[in-house]
Amino acid sequence: ISDEVHGLIIYPGKKHIPILCVSAAARAQSVQVTSMSKGFNLMALPHAIIAIADPSLREAWHKAADPFDFYYASNPFSVAAVTKVMDGSADQWLAGVTDYLQKNRNMAVSFLQREVPGMTVTVPEGSFLLWIDCSGLNLAHPAEFLLEKARVSVNDGAAFGNAYGQFIRVNFALTRQKLQEALERIRQALDEKA
């Protein structure tokens, strides 16, 4: 199962390759799950797109999914919105959003690399999330510290596996002013700790 919900937000020079396009072997054994929700900010309109190339795998999916009534989990507004953005008429809007997010990403990465040397930032090629290793900060629980001391809410890396307790995930899909304010508060809280 390949979750490709962030696949629409890809920065220049990079390319998203859906799992079903990787190889014949991948097509034969993969389920691609995606949505327009992240790229087009349609989180309030529930929907999902499930692509299964292999007929026997698709049949197994239908049998497994049938009792859950997934086909009726959406609504007419969701269907209309998804149909509209998939026709290409919102591509220019998505390009503008992607450009804005890239500038936010660059600003956040630059700030953290320059001002918070104990954080190691993985620079994303797409999406609007930073994955940050905080092991250089000497904090027992980085996400808790940032919430309590900096008043900045981040995702605790431990939610993604026990090995990631020293990591945080930061959403940078917000106004540049709010992002700058959050980054400054992180730096200030860490400066006061030192």
Specify the residue positions occupied by each region the protein language model found.
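Catalytic PLP-binding core of fold-type I/II PLP enzymes
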Residues: 1-15
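Hydrophobic residues in well-ordered beta-strands that form the structural core
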Residues: 1-2, 154-156
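Conserved core segment of the aminotransferase class I/II
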Residues: 23-102, 110, 190
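Short hydrophobic/aromatic beta-strand micro-patches
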Residues: 51, 131-133, 171-173
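Helix N-cap motif at beta-to-alpha junctions
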Residues: 54, 136-137, 175-177
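PLP-dependent enzyme catalytic core of the Aspartate aminotransferase-like
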Residues: 145-154, 160-194
